[in-house]
């Protein structure tokens, strides 16, 4: 029996489409014949429906996955206020514990062929006084896919984040260019620069380039991703 795959999805910043790209990846994995599940271990920003607290990002992931996980497994830490998680957690009396997340991930791997773990914010977002999302990626021991929001400043943000991923001893399995600013000048040149630098310095392939979409359509975006290349990269990283 083939061991399950898993990937940690991070971004160059907040609001650059991590959830959108994660959902597109889930659709792509499903089309590839894989049972795909999602974890959003820490979510900040909740709304109540029928007496149940929910999160919009987690809802999007649930809609894209073809393996449904119980909410308490998919998102063990659901914070109500939409702000920096360590600040909200302290206000709400919640301790964001990495061991709990690792245990949830371990259980998710028993239920799916591939588990997409979406981080929160950028690569180094504090979770408590001493640990951040980079520590979470290390604790999970996962290869990373970097979502680059293609807008002014994205080259530096992409290269700095890639370096931070490597400094933690993690593999950058690939990256996705997500065009968040449809009016950006020299978008093609920016993407080409990032592609060349990440290939040379990290051997990280461009998994896909997603055009600006209004409204966002993860199922359509899945066709813009090279899922076969991503699966191979994840398998190589696991060896």
From Swiss-Prot:
UniProt keyword annotations, A-Z: ATP-binding, Biotin biosynthesis, Cytoplasm, Ligase, Magnesium, Metal-binding, Nucleotide-binding
CDD domains named among the record's database cross-references: DTBS
Any GO MF annotation of the entry: dethiobiotin synthase activity
Catalytic activities: (7R,8S)-7,8-diammoniononanoate + CO2 + ATP = (4R,5S)-dethiobiotin + ADP + phosphate + 3 H(+)
Residues given in the record as ATP binding sites: 15-20, 57, 118-121, 178-179
EC number(s) on file: 6.3.3.3
Classification via InterPro entries: DTB_synth_BioD, P-loop_NTPase
Domain of life: Bacteria
Chain residues that bind Mg(2+): 19, 57, 118
One of the GO BP terms on file: biotin biosynthetic process
Pfam families: AAA_26 (PF13500)
Chief location of this protein within or outside the cell: cytoplasm
Pathway: Cofactor biosynthesis; biotin biosynthesis; biotin from 7,8-diaminononanoate: step 1/2
Active site as annotated: 40
Enzyme class: ligase
Gene3D superfamilies to which the protein is assigned, alphabetical: P-loop containing nucleotide triphosphate hydrolases
Assembly and binders: Homodimer.
Its job: Catalyzes a mechanistically unusual reaction, the ATP-dependent insertion of CO2 between the N7 and N8 nitrogen atoms of 7,8-diaminopelargonic acid (DAPA, also called 7,8-diammoniononanoate) to form a ureido ring.
Family per record: Belongs to the dethiobiotin synthetase family.
Name by which UniProt lists this protein: ATP-dependent dethiobiotin synthetase BioD
């Amino acid at each position: 029996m083939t061991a399950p795959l898993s990937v940690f999805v991070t971004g160059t910043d907040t609001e650059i489409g991590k959830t959108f790209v994660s959902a597109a990846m889930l659709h792509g994995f499903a089309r590839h014949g894989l049972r795909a599940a999602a974890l959003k271990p820490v979510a900040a920003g909740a709304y109540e429906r029928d007496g149940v607290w929910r999160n919009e990002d987690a809802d999007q992931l649930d809609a894209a996955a073809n393996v449904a996980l119980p909410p308490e497994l998919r998102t063990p830490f659901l914070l109500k206020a939409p702000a920096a998680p360590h600040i909200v957690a302290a206000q709400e009396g919640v301790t964001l514990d990495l061991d709990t997340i690792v245990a949830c991930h371990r259980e998710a791997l028993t239920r799916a062929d591939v588990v997409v773990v979406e981080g929160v914010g950028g690569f180094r977002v504090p979770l408590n006084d001493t640990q951040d999302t980079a520590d979470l990626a290390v604790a999970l021991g996962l290869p990373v896919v970097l979502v680059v929001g293609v807008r002014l400043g994205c080259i530096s943000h992409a290269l700095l984040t890639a370096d931070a991923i490597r400094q933690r001893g993690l593999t950058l399995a690939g990256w996705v260019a997500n065009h968040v600013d449809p009016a950006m000048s020299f978008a093609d040149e920016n993407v080409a620069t990032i592609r060349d630098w990440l290939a040379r310095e990290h051997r990280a392939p461009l998994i896909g380039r997603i055009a600006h979409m209004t409204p966002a359509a993860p199922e359509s975006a899945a066709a813009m991703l090279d899922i076969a290349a991503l699966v191979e990269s994840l398998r190589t990283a696991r060896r």
